[in-house]
C-alpha cells in the first residue's frame, strides 16, 4: 500500500472539510499521472496506474471505504465514498495547524504576518521565500516537515490572500522561479 497516497487523500479530504464543513458524502479527488507516480514511488503508464489504484483501494477499504477509480487520459479521479469522508472526519484534528491556517486565510483582510504567526506557532523552522513568478507571492513550508510537509504557495490578491498547497515534489516539478 502507498502510505503517501493514503495521506494525500486524507489530507485533501480534511482540507475540504475544514473549508466547507463535514458532510457524509462522496468526495472526488483528481490527480495527474505524474503526481500519482510520485505518491506511489514508481513510474507507471496510465493502464498500470489504474491497476495499482484498484489494488490500493482494496487495501484501504477498511478505513476509507469504497474508492471508485476512473480516468481520462492521464488524469485520474478517485471517488472516495461517504464512509471515507466519515473516517477522515473522525480521525483528523479539527484544532491543528491546518484548521488555524484555513480559519485565518478565510477571513477578509488576513495578512501575511498573521499567517506566518500561525506557521511559527505550530512549527519550529519555517521557510519563507518571496516568489516572483506571476502566480504566487510567497512560498512557505515547515523545514522539518512537521506538522506537515506541504509547500504553501500564497498569493496576495489585493484585498485577500489565497493559497494552494503542493507536495514538495509537485512544487519542484512546476519549476517556479524564486528570488
Regions found by a protein language model. Name each.
Residues 20, 62-69, 120-131, 178:
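Short secondary-structure junctions
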Residues 1-29:
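Positively charged, polyanion-binding regions of nucleic-acid-associated proteins
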Residues 23-43, 98-104:
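Short glycine-rich, basic-tinged beta-strand/loop micro-motifs
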Residues 111, 117-152:
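A cross-family detector of function-defining hotspots
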Residues 146-177:
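Intrinsically disordered, low-complexity regulatory segments enriched in Ser/Thr/Pro
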Residues 27, 37-66:
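Charge-enriched amphipathic alpha-helical scaffolds
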Residues 95-119:
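Long, charged/polar, surface-exposed segments that mediate recognition or autoinhibition
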Amino acid at each position: 500500500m502507498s502510505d503517501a497516497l493514503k495521506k494525500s487523500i486524507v489530507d485533501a479530504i480534511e482540507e475540504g472539510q475544514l473549508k466547507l464543513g463535514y458532510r457524509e458524502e462522496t468526495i472526488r479527488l483528481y490527480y495527474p499521472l505524474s503526481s500519482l507516480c510520485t505518491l506511489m514511488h514508481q513510474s507507471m503508464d496510465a493502464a498500470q496506474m489504474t491497476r495499482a489504484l484498484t489494488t490500493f483501494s482494496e487495501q484501504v477499504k477498511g478505513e476509507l471505504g469504497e474508492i471508485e477509480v476512473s480516468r481520462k487520459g492521464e488524469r485520474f479521479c478517485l471517488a472516495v465514498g461517504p464512509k471515507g469522508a466519515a473516517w477522515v472526519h473522525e480521525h483528523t484534528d479539527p484544532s491543528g495547524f491546518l484548521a488555524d491556517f484555513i480559519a485565518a486565510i478565510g477571513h477578509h483582510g488576513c495578512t501575511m504576518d498573521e499567517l506566518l504567526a500561525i506557521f511559527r506557532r505550530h512549527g519550529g523552522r519555517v521557510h519563507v521565500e518571496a516568489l516572483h513568478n506571476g502566480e504566487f507571492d510567497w512560498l512557505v513550508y515547515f523545514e522539518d516537515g512537521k506538522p506537515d510537509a506541504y509547500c504553501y504557495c500564497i498569493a496576495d490578491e489585493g484585498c485577500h490572500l489565497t493559497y494552494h498547497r503542493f507536495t514538495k515534489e509537485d512544487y519542484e516539478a512546476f519549476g517556479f522561479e524564486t528570488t
